[in-house]
Amino acid sequence: MGLRKKNARNPPVLSHEFMVQNHADMVSCVGMFFVLGLMFEGTSEMSIAFLTLQHGVVVPAEGLPSGSRTLYHYGVKDLATVFFYMLVAIIIHATIQEYVLDKLSRRLQLTKGKQNKLNEAGQLSVFYIVSGIWGMIILASENCLSDPTLLWKSQPHNMMTFQMKFFYISQLAYWFHSFPELYFQKVRKQDIPGQLIYIGLHLFHIGGAYLLYLNHLGLLLLMLHYAVELLSSVCSLLYFGDERYQKGLSLWPIVFISGRLVTLIVSVVTVGLHLAGTNRNGNALSGNVNVLAAKIAVLSSSCSIQVYITWTLTTVWLQRWLEDANLHVCGRKRRSRARKGTENGVENPNRIDSPPKKKEKAP
């Protein structure tokens, strides 16, 4: 399945340019290999480990017609599932890049640096919208909105539903796919350290909530975080788009800081006051994480990612505002010089920098 338009002049096989242009096709072939494995008895079990959720347990459930339901815990086989859906994320990334963002970049006629920023903001906007809608559906279906106590407890405490586990698997797969995308998108070397920290903080936060079974709390914090990040990405798209909409970006700092404060307040109140509950003697082997170490880990992950992202985005927007201010000042100086050079459409002979008139020689 071709996702990239091939150039008239094909680069050498396995060269850097060849890998960048055809990485979606190659990843599609790898993913198809796991799908075709379902057709054969000898490889179907291995393929199932990559394509479906593992470590399921059937538990009794009152009120259901079957009298039971399947809950999940995490295990080593989850790495295979994360790997497969990481391949899916790479394919979706390439599809959005070619059929949406590349066309938008050509229409706006942006420079190479602005194209990279536009591509990043566009990809993240799609991811945040899909994750936000998906996460809100899960919170509503598991009664987290009507029963806030589920944010720090769940029964049983070492299990999760299918949709909850699949959400976390997909989140981990997306952020892991960001590592090879640094190569495929030709990210500048000076930007790679910041990108690695940004991706690592997300993986630390999501992985911590997944491994500590703080599923509902982690999901709510992600929804708050993604809402603010979506606003930042939309502001970036407007910044590179029509100038008529750039005046509305003045509301961005207020909403951004407010969203970060709400996220920190929810983290501190929920984790600091209610996570431990009445039983403070947790058993990590059984999945009970009501211990001080778990609280410190959750609070540190939440605070660290909020502080880092706030500092990074604030710095970026300050640089943009300074650039716009400098351009505005330079433009105003040019206009003032042009006005001084002419008065009512006639050149002013008294200007200091005007060339002296040549004297006419007598015949």
UniProtKB/Swiss-Prot annotation:
It is found in: Endoplasmic reticulum membrane. The chain crosses the membrane at residues 30-50, 81-101, 121-141, 160-179, 192-214, 219-241, 251-271, 296-316. Residues 116-324 form the TLC domain. Residues 51-80, 142-159, 215-218, 272-295 are lumenal. It is a multi-pass membrane protein. Residues 338-363 are annotated as: Disordered. GO terms for biological process: SRP-dependent cotranslational protein targeting to membrane, translocation. Belongs to the TRAM family. This is Translocating chain-associated membrane protein 1-like 1. It comes from Mus musculus (Mouse).
